[in-house]
Curated annotation (Swiss-Prot):
PANTHER family: SEC31-RELATED PROTEIN, SECRETORY 31, ISOFORM D. Component of the coat protein complex II (COPII) which promotes the formation of transport vesicles from the endoplasmic reticulum (ER). The coat has two main functions, the physical deformation of the endoplasmic reticulum membrane into vesicles and the selection of cargo molecules. InterPro entries: Sec16_Sec23-bd, Sec31, SEC31-like, SRA1/Sec31, WD40/YVTN_repeat-like_dom_sf, WD40_repeat_dom_sf, WD40_rpt. Keywords: Cytoplasmic vesicle, Endoplasmic reticulum, ER-Golgi transport, Membrane, Protein transport, Repeat, Transport, WD repeat. It is a peripheral membrane protein. WD repeats lie at residues 5-46, 59-98, 101-141, 151-191, 200-243, 248-288, 291-331, 378-398. It comes from Eremothecium gossypii (strain ATCC 10895 / CBS 109.51 / FGSC 9923 / NRRL Y-1056) (Yeast). This is Protein transport protein SEC31. The keyword Lipid metabolism does not apply. Belongs to the WD repeat SEC31 family. GO terms for molecular function: structural molecule activity. Residues 822-870, 1053-1115 are annotated as: Disordered. It comes from the Eukaryota.
Amino acid sequence: MVKLAEYPRTATFAWSPDKVPVLATGTASGTVDADFSSTATLEFWEVGSAESGPQGSVTADAKFNDLDWSRDGAMLAGALENGVVEFFCARERRSVARVARHTTGVRAVRFNAKQANVAVSGGSQGEIFVWDTNKISAAGYSPFGPGTAMTPIDEVQSLAWNQSLAHVFASAGSSGFASIWDLKAKKEVIHLSYTSPHSGLKNQLAVVEWHPSNSTRVATATGNDNEPVILVWDLRNANMPLQVMSQGHSKGILSLDWCKHDEKLMLSSGRDNTCILWNPEEAQKLTQYPTRGNWCFKTKFAPEAPDLFASASFDNKIQVQTLQNLANKLDLDETAFKQQESEADFWNNVSQSESKEKPVVTKIQAPAWHSKKSPAAHWAFGGKIVRITSDGLGVSVSKPHIEGFEKNVMLDEALQSKNFVPIINKRLAQTVTPTNEEDWSLLESLSMDGKDTYLQEALSFDDNEAVDSQPDTKDEDFFLNLTGQYEPSGEFELDAANPGITLNLLKGELSKAVNLALEKDLLLESLVIALNSDDDQIKQKVKNAYYTKYASNSQLARSLYAISERKIEDLVDNLNVSQWKHIVMAIKTYATEQSKNSLLIRLGDRLLQAGQRQNAVTLYLAGQSLDKVASVWLRELPALESEMRSHKNTLNEAHLEALTEFVERFTVLSAYINEDGGAKLTNEELVSKFLEFVSMASSSGDFELALKFLENLPGDNEQVKTEKQRVLIASGKCATTSATSTRRGKYGSTTVAPGVPGMPAAPMPVVGMQPPANPLADRTASYGAPGYNVAAPMPPPNGRPNPYAAPAPAYQMANPAAHGKYVNSASASPGHNTPRGSVSMPHNPYAPSTNGAGAVSHNSYAPQHVQPAGQPQNMYGVPPQRNFMNQTQDKPPVNPAATNVLSGQSPHLNRKANNGWNDLPEIVKEKKSRAKPVSTAPVAVASMTGMQASPNVTGGTIPPPPITRVTSNTSIAGSPMTPQKLSRKSSVVQTTALNAPVPVNPYAPPVTGRNAVQSPPLNPYAPSGAHAAAPPTGTYSPHLAGQAIDHTHRATPLSNMAAPPQKAMPGPPPKSMARKSTTSEKDIDSANQLLSSIQKAPNGGPPPRKQVVAPQPSVHAASPVAEPVAIPPQQQLIIEFFKEELARVTPLVPPEYNKQLKDCSKRLNILFTHIEKQDLLSAPTIEKLHTIVALLREHKYSDALAVHVDIATNHVQEAGNWLTGVKRLIGLAEATSS
């Protein structure tokens, strides 16, 4: 290959400093185009695309003598023949400044190698000027000179900056010598001249070039034809050259270029029409390239692709070649083939064939960048690049910043906190297409309203849609029917026209009467007869006759057929898609539960084919089909990636951004749609996309995020197995991962996770009665999960800790109960069978299950053989499934997300986050309770945990005490851990001496009136005493009677033997048949003071007085009731303006946009609430809202939208759902402004 590219231009040129370089060419001075045009043009060419012409062009002020590109790639400078130095913006490809400082034509211009904004230019009469491109646009700007010269200088033809010192440069020209200038000294500091040893005459040093790394070494070349030589100087001995290269050019040299990547390579070109490659260190000629048709006045290496070089000649060609342009076997074969062609073929093609002359190679020398490769392998993974040094003795590890490979911190935090609002706001501010914006708006609605509310609004009829809704007039019709019924009167005769029908009616043979009526087309009469018949076949026959006659022509009859026969599929498949909401209504009303989802999906497919893409997605969501939504998004992914290419520098960046956006979108959707269910990815294309994202996350070093997604991919997929093993090894978690690790599911089910293939099993020690690190993640369901009060083996001494276990909590927290959704606070204390000296260790998610041999898995609150009345059961009969991205939350995160992160809107997923240990529900609903009959006294069971902890107590158990006729309202022994503060945070309780119960003695006599111990305050959320037979199951339920534990001796082991039953103490009858509500504000404000310990003496004694026990002191003081905050007047202006603007646009908005208007109003109210409470928005955000208000007043809607984007980008934690309301108000205001 002779050349890579050839551009038909007589022009000087400059390379861009890019890995894939661009060549800029400027029309050369003193030349005439083929069309005799005098226009000077700066053109940009991409290497390899010469056939398609230049990629851009700029008209210059005059033709070019020289052209140079700044090292940062931002600016080009042209030395023009009219004395002007013109500067061009490379990115925008336009002229930015023209400064005429030279008195005659500018001969040379060069940018500084260290400071990209500094340049130097030279011309005739010794004019040299230094430029600062940061100031060239200022009015009256003028460059400055370098200082005083040693001797007078004539024309400056060549300039070069020192590659190490930014203040030193060299010049050469027609004066016969070269000068070294120091801008700090402001003068010429060194004078170079050369006298030929052959002629004794001084040679003209016309060209100068600096060494790429040595600041004291410079090369010069002579421009005369008598003795063309290249001289290499060491400035420490400026009297004589270090090297002389003379056996090369036959005429004067016009250009030099010293390779920046290899100091042993130098290019030269001259008046002998040739380019030569030299080794200046050894003064040896390496390669002489083919002769050109005219002078080669410039040659240069590409700065970042040194394998390429370009040469410009006056033969109207700029050639781009490679250093590896050497003769090979293909060239020899082509030459042999040409020698065999006929004379006629030769003469026919001779005018069109190009010269295939090859370079003459004197010595083959590999460039330095080919010989510096490490003898060992290089590899990159986890965001790091590992290199073995060239000497093989060291290792270099670096973490480069690559666009698109940054850690996705926002997604990682969202998965931990379940708050996806920041991601939604970010994507809404950076939407790519209108369809993409609709998807993220859908997700925002889901985050704010929840799935059910969103679907209800999306599937409901708009205000402008015709839906006739008649008021219910059943009662009025009843009275009308009473007075308006038909009452026969007068004589009449039987119908003589239809005697058969009449006769069969009189005989009661209704079937025959119907047949005769249908034969005579008496359809109405047939319907009346069928209504009086109990035979369904007769009714069906008449209906079929009606449908046959009218259904093909009557739309009402067709609808009656579909509804009457329950053929909803006919509506789904055949009704016009414009009436799809009516079809949805029919599906919801008449379809079976098993078929609803499939029918919604079928209707969604029809809408998608009809082009109603967003409505189809809504129906897929209603039909619980994430796979369908994923297929739609996957089909649109290539188009989205293509759209992103215009905003990214490379195709790879666009691909990674499109992939990340898709994964975020699907993850957010799955989190909101599968809030109560589980989802495993099964779609192969979807799995492949998530695997690609996992690989990208691993490449950036985000192994935790990669593992979260891998948990939700099918485990039987070989690629998933391989990727998971690779991530585990890279993250350092594989060394202690067992082959089969047991972990407790979200609802208490024990699941066995497959380990990494080939890794040894390392069972972890099991520590009894230790709480999980995350109590919300390890709740136990009510369908038979193992109990926690189980005898556990002692941990081995000096056991090796689990490096991946979460850190132990700062306080002792209760274990979940085996039954019930809420955890009884009694389990806060250790089990009675806990051995003394048990080491408190964090919950180990990899520990084997405790329900093996010898383990007890029954309820820790009731004997196994007793089924208490009112025992809460799982209403669905199956364990609740985990949702798509929450399966990995079973294991406590290594770095839990902060709980006090601000957010503009509480995420919908947190609605049920209060089901955790000792947490109050977010919304306390008053439950209706029926009147309770007088019940028997509760069974006082002492030390229940001790009973069930022993595996020997299975068959024979101590019976309960006899039932008495006296009902008791006596308080059962309360839990030693009572709620101290109504908070969503887990309670941290400290027990005081005031209400500390005494240690339990299973052999002590029954408690009497004298030695009865005062119980701590009962929990207000415990069931009333009337539910005597039901064991406590709620979080705040008290212990059973007599089960009091000394908090000061938690580790004291107690006997495994159960205590004898104690007689229940009777009490007065219940005060009320209805359960007292506990949801009033007064109750909530003083939750710890609602109940008191009430005990009664044995039978026969007087009833004891009620003793009110002071509430326990809490670690966290109760929060005072928030008082109204005064809104600053400046912020009140924001509320007033938005309300006024919303009121202005409301009557102007078309009816079809009423939903958007309502949504805008709802979101703005969220903003108003935050301003009124002063609880979210920071001062910068408030200031930007003021800016939006000011811009809207001036009708600058695009500027206001830009401020909105700024808030969404830089204030993510504050930009909640209200921000979309501001955006929509801006759009509505702009649309209605004219």
